[in-house]
Structures are given as C-alpha cells and as structure tokens.
C-alpha cells in the first residue's frame, strides 16, 4: 500500500514532516477569496520557482516578516535600499529577480484595486468563480498545467506579473482551492468539497 492509503492523505505530502502535514491538512486546497492573501500566495509560488515547496514553507514566516506582512501598500514602495536589505536577509530566497517581481506585483495589485478591479474575482473568473473538483485517486494523475492555468498565466504576464508560468499557476490554483486536487482517497477531498458548498 502507498503512503496515500496508509495515511489517508495525498501521497505527495508524505508522513514525516509535521510542517508539510499541517500545510496539507489545514491550508492546501482550501478556497481562498481574500485578495491580499491570494497575492501573497502568488508571490510565494513565484519564490518557489526551481525549489521544493517545503523550502518555502520553512522560510514563509521569515519571508512574510521581511516583506512587511505582504502589505501591498508598503511593498509597492520598496526601493533599491529595500532590495539590498532583502538580498542580505538569510530568512528569504535571495533572488533579485524574484524580489523585484514581488515589488512589481504589489504595484500591479494596487493599480487593479485603484481601478476598481477585484483581484480575487479576477483570478477566480478563470475557473468560473467556483472550485473545480477533480476525481483523481492518485495525486500523480493530476496534470501539471491546464487550459485554465495557461489562460491565467498569460493574463498575469500581460498585466506585468513575473514568475507565473502555467505550471506555477496551476500549483497556485491547487493551493488556493480553485482546483480541489486532493486525491479522492484523502480525507481532505470531501472536506474541501464541502467548504466550497459542494458537499
């Protein structure tokens, strides 16, 4: 039997790292509608590019603190001194390109808000405003990208966001509950489905 069957969880999260298990059991796949929380998750997924998600999880609180709680109003005003400060902060992923992408993302988030656009509603529109519940019994059956993630990635890039290719965007969609990819043998699949009002 696989870990996914013996633990009652998705096979990808394993059974040994408490941080990973807690993330799977309480966060991953839960529908997120808060615009600021969605932007934070998009930034974190961008930081993950080329790295394992557990690396980001272990650094998340440090990244959040270094980026002023992911307050777009503050991050959007970061200058070269802030970039240098962040590049010297061992708590984060010290990539100039990723740091600059986060700053630009905050500026775009504010531009959208100031233009009366709801960042959350815009992102959720790519799945018709409701979570997609997949029927996979094994997490390895899930795709790495979909028509929706390709469309969202293209739209994000058109807006000026970076580190948001279709594979990163699909991982984002899974994490924020736009797609319920908890395998059907996982206890969270039905719980997340119920959260979305599809019990």
Language model features by range: what are they?
Residues 1-199:
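HhH-family (HhH-GPD) DNA N-glycosylase catalytic core used in base-excision repair
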């Amino acid at each position: 039997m696989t870990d996914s069957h013996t633990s009652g969880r998705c096979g990808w999260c394993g059974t040994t790292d408490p941080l990973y298990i807690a993330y799977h059991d309480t966060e991953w796949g839960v529908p997120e509608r808060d615009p600021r929380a969605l932007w934070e998750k998009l930034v974190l997924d961008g930081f993950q590019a080329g790295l394992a998600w557990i690396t980001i999880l272990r650094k998340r609180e440090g990244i959040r603190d270094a980026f002023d709680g992911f307050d777009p109003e503050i991050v959007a005003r970061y200058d070269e001194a802030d970039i240098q400060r962040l590049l010297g902060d061992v708590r984060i992923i010290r990539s100039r390109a990723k740091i600059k992408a986060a700053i630009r993302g905050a500026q775009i988030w504010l531009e959208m808000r100031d233009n009366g656009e709801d960042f959350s509603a815009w992102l959720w529109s790519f799945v018709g405003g409701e979570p997609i519940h997949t029927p996979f019994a094994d997490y390895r059956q899930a795709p790495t990208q979909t028509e929706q993630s390709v469309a969202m990635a293209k739209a994000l890039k058109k807006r000026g966001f970076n580190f948001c290719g279709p594979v990163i965007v699909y991982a984002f969609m899974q994490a924020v509950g736009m797609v319920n990819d908890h395998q059907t043998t996982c206890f969270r699949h039905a719980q997340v489905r119920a959260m979305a009002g599809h019990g």
